[in-house]
């Protein structure tokens, strides 16, 4: 098994909440969907939260979207686009309204759990650098209370965030490099 397959296996089999971190075009959404697919195959009840307010998988831009994954058909991009629940942020830049973003994450986390999800997969945006990226990820981890943080990084770009996660939360961190086949598409909305 390569490092990405190991990460998917660990998250799908053992985590209750996994947060995927990485810069732009790191493959977070692809790995999150692979984790959801495998978890579904082994009998887990999965909810997918898309916390990237610009490059959306679940729901429209400027929102946090949540989708229950009940079958493999729910993992197609067309099906994922239709959220089961939304939280409005109002900007494609998370730093513009951090309170709205964190509040939406908390409400959708609670709703997913109430509605029976035993695995919550959180796909985050690519803001990882500087104090703004570090604070954003700190507050996300704080409110989501994951038992696994999965990071896809180029070089050591996530190490400052991993240091914060380790120091303040003591949560398991799974590191992997960005897959060499990841295609950079950039951010068209920002």
Name each model-derived stretch.
Residues 92-103, 124-130, 146-159:
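Conserved Switch II/interswitch segment of TRAFAC-class P-loop GTPases
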Residues 31, 35:
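Hydrophobic positions on the alpha1 helix immediately C-terminal to the Walker A/P-loop
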Residues 24:
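The conserved Walker
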Residues 119-144:
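Conserved P-loop NTPase nucleotide-binding/switch module
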Residues 2-15, 19-21, 43, 47-120, ...:
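Nucleotide-state-sensitive switch-loop elements of NTP-binding domains
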